[in-house]
Amino acid sequence: MYQSPLIQDLHDRGLIAQITDAAALDKLLTEESVTLYCGFDPTADSLHLGHLVPVLILKRFQEAGHKPIALVGGATGMIGDPSFKATERKLNTPDVIASWVGKIRGQVEPFLKFDGANAAIMANNYDWFGGMNCLEFMRDIGKHFSVNAMIKKESVQQRLTREDQGISYTEFSYSLLQGYDFAELNKRYGCVLQIGGSDQWGNIVAGTDLTRRLHQKHVFGLTLPLITKADGTKFGKTESGAIWLDPKKTSPYAFYQFWLNTSDADVYKFMNFFTFLPVARIAEIEAADKASGTKPEAQRILAEEATRLVHGEVALMAARRITECLFSGQLADLTENDLEQLAQDGMPGVQLEKSNTGLIDALVASGLAKSKSEARTFIQSGSVAINGNKAEALDHAIGGDELLYGRFTILRRGKKNYGLISWQ
């Protein structure tokens, strides 16, 4: 049992992998408001689902009265963290990284409050590394790191023992940069806690050691467990790729559907990780689901809570509406924005010219039929619908009010096979 209700809650949720000095941190959190940080390197133009847990940890700490710092790695993003990566990262240009930094800041900011006694801070480590020269780095930072200790890190050893992949000095020096981030944030803002994924443990410990050496301060690290799925497949990925927090890369509808498809074996764990529902409430939901003997409610609750957190209430309502319309066949209730989400990533689709296209050709073009002969068979069997209305004429040409908002037509074969035509 922990004294700090926050640490106890994180423990109960299964969100703690390691803490550098658990007893001292637990005591400190019960005595005062602390400043903590988490770093986010711009490795793409959006954060993905794996970043959501640490973002929510910052939010949990702030709601408990502590002061969070979201550090965007404008400098470290130019290097690339080698931790447990099989190959060296591609180096992106400064202009690309600067663009990504701006986008990531915009994604993190809505989760935090930037006013009040424990107002959050957005920082960029390029602010202190950008003007530092090589001699300063080697003299003031490098002398505090033992190469012997660095080489022993598991993440480095994995690269050194691979015959086809070594590790460059650039990536090898990454932990020095991350370590100095902690020391600099301690000096500037009194930051005493760094959080990160379990793969960051070595870098975080390097930061606690460097801060002690440079500033004689006792600071802490807390790592979060690797998010795994019961079936062994990678979390946060679908057949079409990663689940992004940017709605332009993963629509709110696709985001919502991702959570709806969570397995029974994972759903309660993910409710603890990705929602602010009390642990006791999640246990009640699990007990009710198991007692009911029917379809669990947990997936719907998780999908609603997570979508609301990331995309807001309006986007959640749209995701629910799209889901219900496709289930009921009442496609007339879909808005133009709903159809744009489906065209983005919610449904297999095809772009066609507005030219009196026949239904048979449309079925083939959309992938709902392998050939014109098969398309005719589907139509004759009564299994084809246009915007939810059964289509029976073999010579039917799609047009008029079948072009929803003048832009879209939804074809259905059977009960579950959809194709969305975007008319050009």
UniProtKB/Swiss-Prot annotation:
Motif mapping: 'HIGH' region: 42-51
MF GO annotations: ATP binding; RNA binding; tyrosine-tRNA ligase activity
Catalytic activities: tRNA(Tyr) + L-tyrosine + ATP = L-tyrosyl-tRNA(Tyr) + AMP + diphosphate + H(+)
Keywords: Aminoacyl-tRNA synthetase, ATP-binding, Cytoplasm, Ligase, Nucleotide-binding, Protein biosynthesis, RNA-binding
E.C. number: 6.1.1.1
Keyword Nucleotide-binding listed: yes
Record motif 'KMSKS' region, residues: 234-238
Classification via SUPFAM superfamilies: Alpha-L RNA-binding motif, Nucleotidylyl transferase
GO terms for biological process, alphabetical: tyrosyl-tRNA aminoacylation
Gene3D superfamilies listed in its UniProt record: HUPs, RNA-binding S4 domain, Tyrosyl-Transfer RNA Synthetase
Domain S4 RNA-binding: 357-414
Cellular component per GO, a single term: cytosol
Compartment(s): Cytoplasm
Binding site for ATP: K237
InterPro entries, per the entry: aa-tRNA-synth_I_CS, aa-tRNA-synth_Ic, Rossmann-like_a/b/a_fold, S4_RNA-bd, S4_RNA-bd_sf, SYY-like_C, Tyr-tRNA-ligase, Tyr-tRNA-ligase_bac-type
NCBIfam families according to UniProt: tyrS
HAMAP family, alphabetized: Tyr_tRNA_synth_type1 (MF_02006)
UniProt similarity note: Belongs to the class-I aminoacyl-tRNA synthetase family. TyrS type 1 subfamily.
Function: Catalyzes the attachment of tyrosine to tRNA(Tyr) in a two-step reaction: tyrosine is first activated by ATP to form Tyr-AMP and then transferred to the acceptor end of tRNA(Tyr).
Subunit organization: Homodimer.
Protein name per the record: Tyrosine--tRNA ligase
Source organism (scientific name): Dechloromonas aromatica (strain RCB)
Lineage: Bacteria, Pseudomonadati, Pseudomonadota, Betaproteobacteria, Rhodocyclales
